């Protein structure tokens, strides 16, 4: 037997490095061909992988211990709910249940009130004749097709509002525009209210021109995530209401009263990649009691008086947001618990306070975090009802 002296690797000069017979050369060349094919197959497998999927896997492993800073958004799966709604067993809504399609107010009201209907598809523009009560239900999704809109034209105290969610759990609201008739301080109703609801995910929606507010959360509601959602006022406010404010473009109230001490330990809410856009005056949001995480959001309402307002026993973490052309990005009110404003926030052409006070809570979840430099472009392009339907995975 001859002894062989192999170089590391196999190349076209393989037989120069070894002494071998013609048969051995044939054997080696067969091996070389198979080896090359194997390498090519492996290389093609790697290049055919979605690079986003690869980075997502790596990021998810790392995010077990820390949030990740990334420059663009990612697409995940429905089971990977971001923020507080991922806790307490998670939020799945109606899952893969059979759809009930609605195009009229009567159909929408019937589907919402029917507890056996778990997945509602809204198409077109539906104008509500009266506010709809969504009460005492579990495991339901309501979503819109492209351009779907639910509208109220009623500015009265008792007749305003679009949908009132009460005592419900495991709910998903996605890709819908909720449009009110314009702000009017009559102590009326919000476009949408969550009252004592748990595990709710509001994703890729737009709330505009609510009478009292755009979207409020109160009364022991808990484990809520609001993602890629836009808040705006496009209609001029109406003055002269019984409530006393001539401009009540107050978008989002968290906790209804300083005296609602039953809210202690609840109102755990994440606002991630949301946009408080043109027309918002105050309450972006205004918080009592809750542990609220505001991350990667964009504030650019030029008519603002104040943006984030930390009220009684509010505990707020403000992380990697962009404030642009607004007044008082952070209002510290009497009796707050803590507001942490991280170094990742960007303030451009703002006036008023930008500092926090005390040390806010640490979220028990990990969430993919955009670099502040990517927030404006990502949110202005993606926030709102920008999907074609019930498409999952904002992050």
Language-model-derived ranges and their functions:
Residues 38-45:
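Bacterial N-terminal signal peptides
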Residues 31-33, 45-73:
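Bacterial Sec-dependent N-terminal signal peptides
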Residues 286-395:
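Extracellular beta-rich repeat passengers
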Residues 139-148, 169-180, 196-209, 221-243, ...:
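Right-handed parallel beta-helix
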Residues 24-36:
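Bacterial N-terminal signal peptides that target proteins for export
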Residues 80-121:
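Acidic Gly/Asp/Thr-rich repetitive segments characteristic of extracellular carbohydrate-active
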């Amino acid at each position: 037997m001859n002894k062989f002296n192999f170089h590391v690797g196999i190349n076209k000069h393989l037989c120069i490095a070894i002494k071998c017979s013609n048969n051995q050369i044939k054997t080696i060349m067969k091996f070389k061909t198979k080896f090359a094919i194997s390498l090519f197959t492996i290389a093609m497998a790697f290049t055919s992988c979605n690079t986003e999927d690869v980075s997502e896997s790596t990021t998810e492993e790392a995010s077990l211990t820390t949030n990740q800073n990334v420059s663009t958004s990612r697409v995940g799966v429905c089971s990977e709910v971001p923020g507080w709604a991922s806790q307490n067993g998670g939020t799945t809504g109606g899952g893969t249940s059979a759809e009930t399609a609605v195009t009229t107010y009567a159909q929408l009201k019937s589907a919402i009130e029917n507890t056996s209907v778990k997945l509602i598809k809204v198409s077109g523009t539906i104008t509500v004749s009266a506010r709809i009560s969504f009460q005492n239900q579990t495991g339901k999704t309501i979503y819109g097709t492209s351009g779907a809109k639910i509208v109220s034209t009623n500015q009265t105290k008792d007749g305003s509002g679009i949908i009132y969610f009460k005592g419900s759990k495991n709910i998903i609201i996605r890709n819908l525009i909720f449009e009110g008739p314009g702000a009017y301080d009559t102590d009326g109703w919000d476009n949408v209210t969550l009252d004592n609801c748990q595990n709710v995910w509001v994703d890729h929606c737009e709330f505009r021109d609510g009478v009292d507010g755009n979207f409020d959360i109160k009364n022991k509601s808990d484990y809520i995530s609001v993602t890629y959602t836009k808040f705006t006022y496009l209609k001029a406010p109406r003055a002269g209401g019984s409530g006393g404010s001539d401009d009540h473009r107050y978008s989002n109230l968290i906790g209804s009263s300083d005296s609602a001490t039953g809210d202690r330990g609840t109102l755990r809410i994440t606002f991630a990649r949301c946009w408080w856009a043109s027309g918002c005056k105050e309450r972006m949001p205004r918080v009592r009691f809750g542990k609220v995480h505001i991350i990667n959001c964009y504030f650019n309402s030029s008519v603002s008086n104040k943006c984030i307002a930390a009220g009684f026993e509010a505990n707020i973490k403000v992380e990697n947001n962009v404030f642009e052309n607004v007044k008082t990005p952070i209002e510290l009110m009497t009796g707050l618990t803590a507001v942490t404003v991280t170094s990742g926030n960007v303030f451009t052409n703002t006036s008023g306070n930008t500092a926090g006070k005390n040390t806010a809570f640490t979220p028990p979840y990990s969430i993919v975090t955009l670099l502040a430099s990517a927030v404006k472009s990502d949110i202005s392009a993606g926030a709102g009802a920008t999907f074609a339907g019930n498409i999952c995975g904002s992050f």
